[in-house]
Regions:
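Hydrophobic single-pass membrane-targeting/anchoring helices
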Residues: 2-38
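Compositionally biased, intrinsically disordered low-complexity regions
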Residues: 13-19, 39, 61, 140, ...
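N-terminal export signals and maturation junctions of secreted/periplasmic proteins
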Residues: 27-103
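Catalytic glycan-binding domains that act on GlcNAc-containing polysaccharides
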Residues: 71-257
């Protein structure tokens, strides 16, 4: 272990350098004409659009905190970005809506929709891993359940939820499109679709929970070190960081076309 530490540290240092070099591509407030705006939160839907709830009084705008995250993004943006990136529109609504919600809740975080989408791609192929699909209602079907963390090829993590979240009362398993551990979901689980419950298998709930988790600790994700710290808190390892980074950069580039 000691002999490998310098290599691992060098890898992380190199990755941080890459993040700092491409931060304009991956994260909000980019200055690059090629990707300007691609990594920032998408346009917000107007109150008059059919997908948004009716205002309480004439001319009033709905409170974004009370609107399901999937209804927050502009429909035309979703259609165009889904076509250019290949991310299914229903799932893209969850990523983009969660980024918009965090723009209101924690504006200093500056979370790009493409960072959420990159994690979703790496963790579950946008909810399609092992033959699962995300339904029009936003639910992964069949439910996405990760491997048992039994100490084999993965770290050992004994059951923390009596199997209530992951169906395994011996070992913990990551669940849902964003692959939350039961103990993490217990703390960060969110209700993104406004149905009164937090469901890790629902892409809106999972995306909003992931957004809040990444932004905690007053991080500014336009800063390379903060971005790396956020991804590290989600899943450690320079290889994982590099995969998420590549996905985030690719999605931003595709969306800008």
């Amino acid at each position: 272990v000691r002999e490998r530490l310098p290599v691992l540290c060098a890898g992380l240092a190199g990755l941080l350098g890459v993040v700092l070099l491409v931060v304009a591509v991956v994260l909000p407030d980019t200055e690059s004409d090629a990707v300007k705006g691609a990594a920032s939160a998408p346009p917000e839907a107007r109150a008059s659009t059919s997908s948004a709830p009716q205002a309480a009084s004439r001319g009033a705008q709905p409170d974004p905190a009370q609107v399901p995250v999937a209804q927050l993004p502009d429909g035309a943006w979703i259609e165009a970005t889904a076509a250019s990136t290949g991310v299914e529109a229903r799932v893209l609504r969850a990523y983009a809506g969660a980024a918009l919600r965090l723009e209101r809740e924690q504006p200093g975080c500056r979370l790009g929709w493409n960072t959420l989408a990159a994690i979703g791609a790496v963790e579950s192929e946008h909810g399609t891993i092992d033959g699962s699909v995300v339904t029009d209602d936003g639910v992964a079907d069949p439910p996405i359940i990760g491997v048992a963390l039994d100490g084999g090829d993965v770290r050992a993590l004994k059951d923390t939820d009596d199997g209530e979240v992951d169906g395994d009362d011996r070992w913990d398993r990551a669940v849902g499109p964003m692959q939350f551990l039961p103990s993490t979901w217990e703390r960060w689980g969110a209700d993104g679709d406004g149905d009164g419950r937090a469901d890790p298998q629902h892409v809106d709930d999972a995306a909003l929970a992931a957004a809040r988790y990444l932004c905690h600790g007053e991080r500014d994700l336009t800063r390379g070190p903060d971005w790396v710290a956020a991804i590290s808190s989600y899943n450690e390892g320079s290889e994982y960081h590099a995969r998420v980074l590549e996905q985030a950069r690719s999605l931003a580039s595709l969306a800008a076309r």
